[in-house]
Amino acid sequence: MPGCLVLVVGPSGAGKDTLLRLARAALAGDPRYVFPRRLVTRPPSADEDNDEIDEAAFAEGCAAGRFTLSWRAHGLGYALPEAVGRRVAEGHVVVCNVSRRVVAGARESGRRVSVVEITAPPEILARRIAARGRAQDGDLAARLAREGGVTADLTILNTGAADEAAARLVAHLRAC
């Protein structure tokens, strides 16, 4: 069975990490599903499932092609380890939280790609971002002003119970 790279995108505060955590728990018994940790040039937080990488290692990894995908956002570097591409090639469904900016390149990579957009109304996004209380989240207005600009295979409006939104995500992953 062919693998699939599932790219989860959406604005800050949409609840991507919450839904990914719930989906990972729901699919924990099935080795076909992989939820790798991103590399980010900041210390990990309780709200995200990331590993820290310093700026020099990030720049070196980008230059050497050691990442499946990499991008910069909010003044930080983000990357998916090269093992992500191998897992897709082995037939796994690999589910990653990424920037919309990398979707076009991922679709051109020759891998099977599915895009899931998780979103919420601006007032909910603002409330969730403010509740994090992280100085590195930067300018709240700038984060909320970003446009989608990506065609998704599934869009989840995450305004109600997280379990309901996660069930939609899990159903999509099982269909991949």
Curated annotation (Swiss-Prot):
UniProt catalytic activity: alpha-D-ribose 1,5-bisphosphate + ATP = 5-phospho-alpha-D-ribose 1-diphosphate + ADP
GO molecular function: ATP binding; ribose 1,5-bisphosphate phosphokinase activity
Descriptive protein name: Ribose 1,5-bisphosphate phosphokinase PhnN
Claim: Glycosyltransferase is one of the keywords in the record: no
Classification via HAMAP family: PhnN
EC number(s) recorded for this UniProt protein: 2.7.4.23
Biological classification of the source: Bacteria, Pseudomonadati, Pseudomonadota, Alphaproteobacteria, Hyphomicrobiales
Keywords assigned: ATP-binding, Nucleotide-binding, Transferase
Binding-site list for ATP: 10-17
Family the UniProt entry places it in: Belongs to the ribose 1,5-bisphosphokinase family.
Pathway stated in the Swiss-Prot or TrEMBL entry: Metabolic intermediate biosynthesis; 5-phospho-alpha-D-ribose 1-diphosphate biosynthesis; 5-phospho-alpha-D-ribose 1-diphosphate from D-ribose 5-phosphate (route II): step 3/3
An example Gene Ontology biological process: organic phosphonate metabolic process
Function recorded in the entry: Catalyzes the phosphorylation of ribose 1,5-bisphosphate to 5-phospho-D-ribosyl alpha-1-diphosphate (PRPP).
